[in-house]
Amino acid sequence: MNVTSLSFPYGESIQWFCADRTDKLPPSPLKEWLLAPGSLTKKLKTCCNQFEVKVLGEGQLAPFKDEYPQQGSVWVREVLLCLDNVPWVFARTLIPLSLLSEREADFLGLGSRPLGELLFSQDNFIPGRIEVASFDTGSRLAHLAASLDQRVEHLLWGRRRYFHHGQDEMIVSEIFLPAAERAICQ
């Protein structure tokens, strides 16, 4: 896997829209994956023998314009979710700095552990709304996919989900790479 042509952060500013605007969603079965209410990590694990999280980078950064409701820095974590050594999903998480000290979460010590397992195993993280976006073939994420030897021939689709913890809100974006879409839609 070669991701040296780009560097952290890989994400980009994009227009997200409410998932209930079904006229803009891709056809099934990818649509069902985008709108799945539970843990994407858990769903992905049912499709492989070996599940792995590859951390691309993490650190304190300013979010992209219109990416996060509050101004100022957040903790950004970008990973690839790989199934049987094939990257299926690019994930970008925005964590408010106030949550970094949350003892039960240990966001800074996650390493290669899946964030989804943490979020869906604790009652104090409440899943919120899902938004959906598409990324064209010239996007940074399409270039990332190409550097992973995955040709992007049409739009990449992704979702972002809000998680609430008290007064704090974190955002998890998950973009399906071409290998995932091929496997899901075959």
From Swiss-Prot:
Gene3D superfamilies: Chorismate lyase-like. One of its GO terms (molecular function) is chorismate lyase activity. One of its GO terms (cellular component) is cytosol. InterPro entries: Chorismate--pyruvate_lyase, Chorismate_lyase_/UTRA_dom_sf. It catalyses: chorismate = 4-hydroxybenzoate + pyruvate. Keywords: Cytoplasm, Lyase, Pyruvate, Ubiquinone biosynthesis. Substrate binds at residues 77, 115, 174. Pathway: Cofactor biosynthesis; ubiquinone biosynthesis. Its EC number is 4.1.3.40. GO terms for biological process: pyruvate biosynthetic process; ubiquinone biosynthetic process. Its main location: cytoplasm. It is found in: Cytoplasm. Pfam families: Chor_lyase. It is an enzyme of class 4 (lyase). Belongs to the UbiC family. Removes the pyruvyl group from chorismate, with concomitant aromatization of the ring, to provide 4-hydroxybenzoate (4HB) for the ubiquinone pathway. This is Probable chorismate pyruvate-lyase. The gene is ubiC.
